[in-house]
Amino acid sequence: MLAGLSPHLSNLRRSLTQVLNFALVLSTAFMMWKGLSIYTNSSSPIVVVLSGSMEPAFQRGDLLFLWNRSPRAEVGEIVVYNVRGKDIPIVHRVVRAFGDDEKSPKETNGQKKKKVMSSGKKDSIAAGALHSDSALVSHRILTKGDNNIADDTELYAQGQDYLDRKLDLVGSVRGYIPAVGYVTIMLSEHPWLKTVLLGIMGAMVILQRE
């Protein structure tokens, strides 16, 4: 009886080993991803270019590596940001930056210098007004695709004229590998490929068992 169960136990052991190996691969990949996210301070340290708006600098399918520990994003720098309310990363270049050490362009153009009044209550009011005028704004940027005519104002959330460095940016591009991420685009645009891929993986598992 035990001899008859031996082949079944062997097959079960082999199946469990394959499941554990697969789980180990997934957990290792997840840990590496989370570790890279912590190191780069980016929720998505690796992204794929989905459109041709940054041609010729980047093509569709290019794999980008991001870094998000710099306090500022300078003009000319290529960044990745998420539009508020949407989960689609956009890769564009910074064409204007301000904040932290200067005032918002709209605020600067719309404000007038206030005269200091000479006595009592008027002095305190004027001092408060001057303090308000000199208040710094958070670092904000305006972006644009190299292959686009207009800037990204129309892409931002409703009522948003600029991106906030801390709230909107996923990271700045520090490196890339051409065309490697095109598989991701193909799977996204052609869902049936996922079924084919899963079928191939299943066939490979069955063949390995035999």
UniProtKB/Swiss-Prot annotation:
GO BP, sorted A to Z: protein targeting to ER; signal peptide processing
List of catalytic residues: S53 (charge relay system), H92 (charge relay system), D152 (charge relay system)
Glycosylation-annotated residues: N41
Domain of life (superkingdom): Eukaryota
Enzyme class: hydrolase
Cytoplasmic-side positions: 1-21
MF-aspect GO terms: serine-type endopeptidase activity
Transmembrane segments annotated in the record for this chain: 22-38
GO cellular component: signal peptidase complex
Topological domain spans for side Lumenal: 39-210
Keywords tagged on the record: Endoplasmic reticulum, Glycoprotein, Hydrolase, Membrane, Protease, Signal-anchor, Transmembrane, Transmembrane helix
Subcellular location: Endoplasmic reticulum membrane
Substrates-to-products reaction catalysed: Cleavage of hydrophobic, N-terminal signal or leader sequences from secreted and periplasmic proteins
Membrane topology: Single-pass type II membrane protein
Region (C-terminal short (CTS) helix): 196-207
Cross-referenced CDD domains: S26_SPase_I
Listed EC numbers: 3.4.21.89
PROSITE patterns linked to this entry: SPASE_I_1
Function noted in UniProt: Catalytic component of the signal peptidase complex (SPC) which catalyzes the cleavage of N-terminal signal sequences from nascent proteins as they are translocated into the lumen of the endoplasmic reticulum. Specifically cleaves N-terminal signal peptides that contain a hydrophobic alpha-helix (h-region) shorter than 18-20 amino acids.
Notes concerning its domains: The C-terminal short (CTS) helix is essential for catalytic activity. It may be accommodated as a transmembrane helix in the thinned membrane environment of the complex, similarly to the signal peptide in the complex substrates.
Subunit-level organization: Component of the signal peptidase complex (SPC) composed of a catalytic subunit SEC11 and three accessory subunits SPC1, SPC2 and SPC3. The complex induces a local thinning of the ER membrane which is used to measure the length of the signal peptide (SP) h-region of protein substrates. This ensures the selectivity of the complex towards h-regions shorter than 18-20 amino acids. SPC associates with the translocon complex.
Family recorded in the similarity comment: Belongs to the peptidase S26B family.
The protein, known as: Signal peptidase complex catalytic subunit SEC11
UniProt lineage: Eukaryota, Fungi, Dikarya, Ascomycota, Pezizomycotina
